[in-house]
Design a protein with these regions (language model features):
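Thiamine diphosphate
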Residues: 1-4, 11, 19-23, 28-137
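Active-site-adjacent substrate-binding region
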Residues: 16
Length: 140
């Protein structure tokens, strides 16, 4: 959260290699091609674990860069469904917990990888500002 106090700092906490690749590619494009005055703060882990392929969802890369995307859904029972959000080191444990919830307690879930809580915050602040400046466009 400290990185949110620096306006041109883009911070990420990816879990999987494909997330890091998407972030690096976009960072190079923004800093070198577009010459944006930004820098990246990326937290990575040194734990050795299997990395899945990038999901087939067409919105996956956009979600990675915006800060959150759905990586998995358990929907066998269609009664109770919970949303699980996680990033970095805890995400893999959350996936394991979702499997336990489904197998032992019949609770379905959606698992969301949060690559950047700061980017989500920025997006929310931007929407809030737009709504304040465009009150006549808001439909209640």
């Amino acid at each position: 959260m400290l990185a949110s106090t620096i306006p041109n700092c883009i911070s990420y906490d990816p879990t999987f290699g494909y997330e890091l690749a998407v972030i690096f590619r976009d960072g190079l494009r923004r800093m070198h091609e577009k010459k944006e005055n930004i820098f990246y703060y990326i937290t990575t882990m040194n734990e050795n674990y299997p990395h899945p392929e990038i999901p087939k969802d067409k919105n996956c890369e956009e979600g990675i860069l915006k800060g959150m995307y759905k990586i998995k859904e358990y929907s066998q029972y269609k009664k109770t469904k919970i949303q699980l959000l996680g990033s970095g080191a805890i995400l893999r444990e959350m996936i394991a917990a979702a499997e336990v919830l489904q197998k032992e307690y019949q609770i379905d879930s959606e698992i969301w990888s949060v690559t950047s809580f700061n980017e989500l915050r920025r997006d929310g602040l931007e929407v809030e500002r737009y709504n304040l400046l465009n009150l006549s466009l808001i439909h209640i």
